[in-house]
Amino acid sequence: MKIEVCIDNIESVHIAQNAGADRLELCACLSVGGVTPSYSLIKSAVDFANIPCYVMIRPRAGDFLFSTQEVNMMLDDIHLAKQLGAQGIVIGALTKHADIDLSVCETLIQAAEGLGVTFHRAFDLCRDPVTSLEQLIQLGCERVLTSGQKASAVEGQPLIKQLVSQASNRIRIMAGAGINAQNAALLVKNTGITELHLSGKGYRLSEMPYHANAVMGENSEDDQKIWRTDFATIRAVKTSVEKY
């Protein structure tokens, strides 16, 4: 059983690895589902971590219908990820009709030659998951992250189980969205998945004794919180699925 932890700061890299993560997904802005991280975060994570680092390739929040300029930006980010020594990338592109954008994905995958490729939860917005999975297999993706096209992986268990059966070891199905120590083992048992994805989000309070009245986040409380991976959450999930 593999545990992938998505992170958006260097503190979380240390915490996730020490808690037992098997792989890191490097992002910025997890609050919007993750976008491409900075040069410095990729470099620092790759230099420090002794587990694989996969870089999110997503130029903005929102949908997964990308312009030509955005595709070119993603190509630049893939080249950077390779240059910095990342082990893989995380991509997803759809057509306006909610099908896999085969042309864009093929272009991105070709640019990533030599790296592992995960197709992210854009899959959960596809109108035909069965056909889409076959297309991702043909494209050469090594795994797809999915919640079973529901708000959480627990709700999406029926489709996840179906996808595991359909994949038949041709591609890995990684479940994500709402994973915790209370549901991880049952999800694995019910669906047959071999990989789990989570952020294990927690926070620590700012160490600054002086707090201005200015608001940088959505509310003043956010200004005093540093969001990061929670060690206990990752360790608990890891422990709960060890027998698998």
Curated annotation (Swiss-Prot):
InterPro entries given in the database record: CutC-like, CutC-like_dom_sf
Electron transport is among the record's keywords: no
Domain of life: Bacteria
GO (cellular component) term, any one: cytoplasm
Protein location: Cytoplasm
Protein family according to the UniProt entry: Belongs to the CutC family.
HAMAP family: CutC
PANTHER family, A to Z: COPPER HOMEOSTASIS PROTEIN CUTC, COPPER HOMEOSTASIS PROTEIN CUTC HOMOLOG
Protein name as catalogued: PF03932 family protein CutC
Organism this protein belongs to: Pasteurella multocida (strain Pm70)
Gene: cutC
